[in-house]
Amino acid sequence: MNILITGATGFVGQALCRELVNIYRFQTIFAAIRPENSTTSLPLPIKPIIINSLRDLSENQEVLAQLDCIIHLAARVHQMRDTTPDPLAAFRAINTTATAQLAQAAAQVGVKRFIYLSSIKVNGEHTRPGQPFTAKDIPHPQDPYGISKAEAEIQLRQIGDRTGLEVVIIRPPLIYGPGVKANFHSLMTWVDRGLPLPLGAIPNRRSLVALPNLVDLMITCLTHPAAPNQTFLVSDNHDLSTPELLKTMARALGKPSRLIPIPIPWLQALTTLVGKPNLAQRLCSSLQVDIRPTQHRLGWTPPVSISDAMAITAQDFQRQKNRPKGSPQFNP
């Protein structure tokens, strides 16, 4: 089987490349990367394809014609401080239009399967108690990123219906693992410093997915006969409250968890005072996903527990923290 990975030098892409090389003996694995990422080391025998944009890849029929499957990870990602004049147009250009163009070009030259890493933001931003998101829910994206992903899903399904391209859509919630950045990294930094956190009284439930579990599902979908033309939600199948998450982090880091229980309205007022009114919503709301259909259809279960996944995440966090400034990064 010949496959191509877009976004191969990203957080998810690097982990996927390593696992593909370690476990599977594909004839050829291509990785589409941008020139500025060309120095990022990829495991052998992955073959890099340098592209300036996804359009370059869509027009490269010589490469596409060799492929059995594309795993499409490349995307314009969610940004907390987006200064783009028209964020929705910027997200659509890459996440919707360029994705559809790539899938259409792939279908025209006979690529069999197209695995698309979407987002749980297609479903929405939060769930009510006892009502986890499912793949059958009516999409309700709340921001430009989620809208662009939802529209891409629609176009991919239409392309699949017209051409016979086997489309597989995966919607992950928050992904964590070695190399994680953004909010999850910030939480780990706070816990590692032993800072008292006013988050001890939050009764929410949140689904997460460890990077190795997400990678395992994507690899399962490469060849599984029941995967085509399906949408799969994924998680660790072990939902946590925010206090439970922080305690799990603390154990993995070998640090005490200093959680102060304060009423949620106080927390909301506090985050507003520091200029981050939406932070309390993200910390206090619930977001749960139902992965039972994924498990039943694919016979799949997350292979790595939350405690083990958090341990390897913490080990990488400590390694990066202790790395001398200016030295090259290496993700084992």
Give names to the regions the model predicted.
Residues 180-186, 200-223, 229-233:
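Substrate-positioning beta->alpha
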Residues 3-24:
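N-terminal Rossmann NAD(P)H-binding glycine-rich loop of SDR-like oxidoreductase domains
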Residues 220, 224-279, 307, 311-314, ...:
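Mid/C-terminal beta-alpha module of Rossmann-like enzyme folds, strongest
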Residues 177, 199-204, 232-239, 250-254, ...:
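Glycine-rich Rossmann NAD(P)(H)-binding loop
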Residues 100-144:
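Conserved Rossmann-fold NAD(P)-dependent oxidoreductase catalytic core, especially the SDR/UDP-sugar
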Residues 140-168:
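Active-site Tyr-X1-5-Lys
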Residues 51-97, 101, 105-108, 125:
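NAD(P)H-binding glycine-rich loop region in Rossmannoid oxidoreductase-like domains
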Residues 211, 270-301:
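Conserved C-terminal active-site "lid" loop/helix of NAD(P)H-dependent oxidoreductases
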